[in-house]
């Protein structure tokens, strides 16, 4: 086969050239492919991270003598103009330019000429986008940390007001033992505290710099990657260029942490939904967080917790999607990774919105004048106590009472089961059985048994670290207040 000289591009081809990589190609990209492959209309939210990364890269290029001081100054001026244009809404995002990176670079070149073309020296979009996503996610994690704190504070606020309120504790959704309502709220504080810790762990591994890895193999330019990392406030640089540009485990790890957080929200949602129902009547949710029915005028529906429960499935689905996205990719970068952004962005948005609305729904809205919160969940102590009383919640306390009288626990367990059966047949609580009837189950039972059988006595008796006794709950409240500020 004979070879021929390289064909020169026609004027039509030059006129239709839009992509930064078009010189090799003999025809422009089809409009269908442009629409299919473009990401600019969802990844443009990375613009601040993209500009920050570019400025840090330009600073380093100038310091290393790779670009001139004049080019460096021009790049900084151009980026300042672009920032103003984006913030004001004047910036024109173009589908032809594919993504946030090329849109900004094209505008920079339009503003400052060849200096804009020199900005991309020593980098690829592969390491550029990995850097942008890490910078963006770092900032979002910091906002999520604040929102998690606010939700915990709301739960602590509610707990402080309800230390002495008795709630039936459930296992298998059946009454088990009485607990302080505050103790129950603090269980969620513990969960969200662990969620915050996980987010900080994710942040540490996210806050590492890929920039300088170029397409996959590093670069021939004498880059100072550590300088760029310091400028961007990152804790170090990725040590392997292939890994740096190709993996999205930090995004997967974040989405896993977000999924766990949403699972905790979903569990709280389930309880709020149950407690609000007429069959329980334990709490009331403020009207502004409920909706009505188009046909049933009596309805107040807990749409917010129901939606949060549903959105949890959405976030968990994003986690599965991201894991599946990565599982079959050979090293290094593949276009598949463009699909990491929409699930990641939606996970962040969903989690932030959910935490924000739950903090207000549970704890109320802070009055700027007084600093107090108003309009959170309203607790019905009478309904809670009645439910605990009806469910033989102090049966375990009677067993413990008999153990202290010398019975082996298994014998005490069996004895109390017979007592519960008798109380059930008479439609009364254990504490309402006459002493003589109780003594018929075991002669060691004395008058002091009624202290053990009272809900208040049961609560106070669990005065061990982590227990539900009011004294222990107040200790935990003080710990959380000090931690949350």
Curated annotation (Swiss-Prot):
Alphabetized UniProt keyword annotations: Amino-acid biosynthesis, Arginine biosynthesis, Cytoplasm, Lyase
E.C. designation(s): 4.3.2.1
Catalytic reaction annotation: 2-(N(omega)-L-arginino)succinate = fumarate + L-arginine
An example Gene Ontology biological process: L-arginine biosynthetic process
Enzyme class: lyase
Pathways per UniProt: Amino-acid biosynthesis; L-arginine biosynthesis; L-arginine from L-ornithine and carbamoyl phosphate: step 3/3
Chief place where the protein resides: cytoplasm
GO molecular function: argininosuccinate lyase activity
Gene Ontology CC terms, in alphabetical order: cytosol
Keyword Zinc-finger annotated: no
Similarity comment text for this entry: Belongs to the lyase 1 family. Argininosuccinate lyase subfamily.
PANTHER family (UniProt xref): ARGININOSUCCINATE LYASE
Annotated protein name in UniProt: Argininosuccinate lyase
Organism of derivation: Paracidovorax citrulli (strain AAC00-1) (Acidovorax citrulli)
Encoding gene (name): argH
